[in-house]
Amino acid sequence: MQILYELRYPTRWYTKLLMALSALVFFAVLATTAIAGFLVYRIVKPQRTSSEINMASFPGRPEVLNFEVPGGLGTREGWFFPGFRGAPTIILCHGYESSRGELLTLESALQDHQYNVFIFDFAAHGANAGISTLGYREVDEVRAAVDLLAARPDLDPTRFGLWGYNLGAYAALREAERDKRIRALVLDSVYDEPKQMVKVGVERNGLGGFPFMVRAAGLSFEYLNYAHREDPPLSQKLLALVGVPTLYIQALDDPELAETTRQMFLKAPEPREQAILPHGNFVSLNDEEKRAYENRVVSFFLVRLPASGMTVR
């Protein structure tokens, strides 16, 4: 009883110090949790950018295609750029805080070599509402896009290629691990688990150095995505890609994602290729860097997934 009384009405110096430290720790934890929660909200609700094009005058004869995403995720609008009849279809999966409109030059480079190309916006990007799960549910959007295109009579339903950057790379790789229609992959700055992208988001907000901030943000993100708590890291199913050519692109100016990409490459089965670039994020490259990047991506697909036509339905 004396101990409880002393804790309630501290009179000794060490008891007062203990109570002060306890209060400090409590408020520090409370502040960290609150800030982490706010950061996660900003991460899953990124600032959206939307691009529109004049379909009648834009080069490449684009066509608007709409498709439903299962699980109540709503309708997506995509732009389809036709290539050679029966040639493979390349789906471009944009990165976090990006949009389909920022990939039009990469699209043109692929279409110029007779590939069919399709681009769309993920949830919480472009004109789409919702929140981003950093890959958990975005893979369903990629699957819905593949299903839509595979049903077209002018396309080969068995030959698809995927290109993706960070968020898009995660969704593309997750889809390829379970879909034999995916015949080639280009993965730029891919991560193994979405919580790794949360860490990147915290660090980009300048709070990565605060004690326990990354951990608190990760826990908040996992709580929001509790339904996916059993989803394994991508690296656990990489053997499903045996025989699927994959190009891993590391960007040295993004050390965190460069390291995760390197680790994924080391664990990946053959055939695999690695490209190490000084700068990443295609949409932020200068014109010369974009041309070099486009040439690398197009060359990979030309060798690994030739743009030859096949008999279609």
Feature-to-residue mapping (PLM):
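The serine-hydrolase catalytic nucleophile loop
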Residues: Y96-A109, I131, T260
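Alpha/beta-hydrolase active-site loop
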Residues: T133-P153
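Conserved alpha/beta-hydrolase
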Residues: E107-A129
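Short beta-strand element of the alpha/beta-hydrolase
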Residues: A87-G95
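Hydrolase active-site cap/lid region
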Residues: E177-A227, L239-V244, E259
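Serine-hydrolase catalytic core
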Residues: V69, E77-W79, L224-T311
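An N-terminal hydrophobic leader/cap segment in hydrolases
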Residues: W13-V69, E77-W79
